[in-house]
Amino acid sequence: MADITLAQLLEAGVHFGHKAYRWNPKMFPYIYTERNNIHILDLVQSAQLLKEANSYLQSAAEKGQTFLFIGTKPQASALIAQEAKRCNSYYVNHRWLGGMLTNWVTLKSRIARLKTLEQEEADQVFNLLPKKEASLRRKELEKLRKNLNGIKDMEKLPDVAIVIDQKREMTAVIECRKLGIPIISILDTNCDPDLVDIPIPGNDDAVGSIKLVLQSLTDSINTGKLTTK
């Protein structure tokens, strides 16, 4: 796909960081200036690192690697599911449950439970149960779907993680690092670039910014899948 231009990044508001007092000094190399107490990110670096991330993802997809999209904040939730589905990947967009990756064996048992309940629902088993029991199972199914629907077909740990809002998803970031899973993440001015493998300096709050970057990353995965080795 064509590289994202500086004009596109600018229009999407990718350059807007947080208020200066909220910054992480480790982000200093990626900050262009400060304006009205708001840090402005260097879009030249954002474009270069987005290109690097895209190249990495395309290559990983060519090798048949798997991807997990992580983003639970309201601005990102729907986009995370949409883009992950568009490249046939996995996602967590409601709530990160501690141990989702590091306690994979336990998580697999919860996924098995989800699939059992879904089968019971499809077979209309709930209609044969006492009202109270049926209600409890429906509530359990709804909760499991919310938390696990995006990873219910994930049979092994993902090869690459794509994260929106490092601060919010720190538990997921720590689990990925513990397991050696490479992380690509949009990093706002309050983030820590040392905790990711490929940082993409950018606004992780604005929907337009999140959408532009996620779509670009997804396009690269799809390009790679077309030429799977």
Swiss-Prot record:
Pfam families attached to this UniProt entry: Ribosomal_S2
What's this protein's name?
Small ribosomal subunit protein uS2c
Chief location bin: plastid
**GO molecular function: any one?**
structural constituent of ribosome
Please indicate which superkingdom the organism of origin belongs to: Eukaryota
Cite the entry's keywords alphabetically.
Chloroplast, Plastid, Ribonucleoprotein, Ribosomal protein
Query: Which Cys-Cys disulfides exist here?
Result: none
Can you supply one Gene Ontology CC term for this chain's record? chloroplast
BP terms from Gene Ontology: translation
Localization (cell):
Plastid, Chloroplast
Tell me which family the UniProt entry assigns to this protein.
Answer: Belongs to the universal ribosomal protein uS2 family.
Corresponding gene? rps2
Name the NCBIfam families for this protein: rpsB_bact
Which source organism? Trieres chinensis
